[in-house]
Amino acid sequence: MTSPTLPADRVLLSPDARRAAVIDLIRGARTRLALSLFRCNDKGIFRELAAAVARGVDVEVLVTSRAKGGKKKLRKLWQRLEETGATVYAYNDPVVKYHAKYAVADEGPALVASLNLTKKCFAKTCDAVVLTWDPEVVHGLRQLTATDRDGIAPPANLTPRLILGPETARRQFTDLIRTARSSILMIDPKFSDPDLMALLDQRRADGVRVHVHQDCRVGTMKAHGKIMLVDGARAVVGSLALTALSIDFRREVAIQITEPSAIADIQSLFTSIGVTAAEPGSVPAAAGGAPC
């Protein structure tokens, strides 16, 4: 018997599509839902979580224990989540700050995002949501939820599609940049890691086309999500910024994508802001404006 063909990975870039993807994943959960978030103030998300619990779904939410605004703001978030009936766990590593943004429903699909579940990110930011049915990604995120919830080391056998900060992020991003053959395009207003900046300089000298968009705006949207496109064939979307703090001292999750239709959508995003017009070897410090 042949295995059923899984749906192709999708990348959602428009504000309405991003929010709909999150809502649909929660609504589609039948028995269990794992959600990892940093911020959430969207009433619709809270309603959907409560509805999932009401229909018998086991909902677990993993959240940060440290954020700007202090404990009062976090307690309000925890209270709102607990009111839905979800079981809430706080990530309590004494050094590593929690910033991962993903969700898994049942045995799939899984969602990896660059955005927070906030009214602002659902309306005013340049962000991306990746939806995947890849069983290795689904299983890996399930494992990661369990280990982070229990305060133990993450699994060592995660699919290489997942980029995990701080454990593997530096090595994986270094490999992506080192192995690029023709182009490296990035949207990352916070990009500042010295080692990766030096590596991009080296690749630029090798003749690789490099463009880093560091403007505070991406078209009409506020720059927030971190998106990388390598050789027009591999993309990375997730919570990571290419800063030393984000790479080395935060729980972050990003996902690598090669699905052609998803790559085409990401390429269209870069084209819409003129990034592909960069000449080989160029790396504008801030395409379209001053650095954030």
Language-model features: locations:
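HKD-type phospholipase D/PLD-like phosphodiesterase module
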Residues: 1-28, 36-179, 187-270, 274-275, ...
